[in-house]
Amino acid sequence: MSITVEEKARLIKEYATKEGDTGSPEVQVAVLSSRIATLTEHFKAHKKDNHSRRGLLMMVAQRRKLLDYLKKKDEGRYTALIARLGLRR
């Protein structure tokens, strides 16, 4: 249901803007997107799991806030990230 330590480390390494970067919006959005995809698969089998669905909605909202922040600060980085992750908008 959650992502593994190795998967998270791979995402951090792939989306980091510099060495040791774990807090940039790009990294945070990539990790959230991976967790959202995992939970989406979970809901295909467990349709009535409303407790976890609330967590999913909170993650989607957090990702949206981070993307809005990135768009406001640097639209070029925003469009590049959207393209790399394959997100709509």
Swiss-Prot record:
GO terms for biological process: translation. SMART domains: Ribosomal_S15 (SM01387). It holds the Pfam family Ribosomal_S15. InterPro entries: Ribosomal_uS15, Ribosomal_uS15_bac-type, uS15_NS1_RNA-bd_sf. GO terms for molecular function: rRNA binding; structural constituent of ribosome. Keywords: Ribonucleoprotein, Ribosomal protein, RNA-binding, rRNA-binding. It comes from the Bacteria. GO terms for cellular component: cytosolic small ribosomal subunit. HAMAP family: Ribosomal_uS15_B. NCBIfam families: S15_bact. Part of the 30S ribosomal subunit. Forms a bridge to the 50S subunit in the 70S ribosome, contacting the 23S rRNA. One of the primary rRNA binding proteins, it binds directly to 16S rRNA where it helps nucleate assembly of the platform of the 30S subunit by binding and bridging several RNA helices of the 16S rRNA. Forms an intersubunit bridge (bridge B4) with the 23S rRNA of the 50S subunit in the ribosome. PANTHER family: RIBOSOMAL PROTEIN S15, BACTERIAL AND ORGANELLAR, SMALL RIBOSOMAL SUBUNIT PROTEIN US15M. Belongs to the universal ribosomal protein uS15 family. This is Small ribosomal subunit protein uS15. It comes from Cereibacter sphaeroides (strain ATCC 17023 / DSM 158 / JCM 6121 / CCUG 31486 / LMG 2827 / NBRC 12203 / NCIMB 8253 / ATH 2.4.1.). The gene is rpsO.
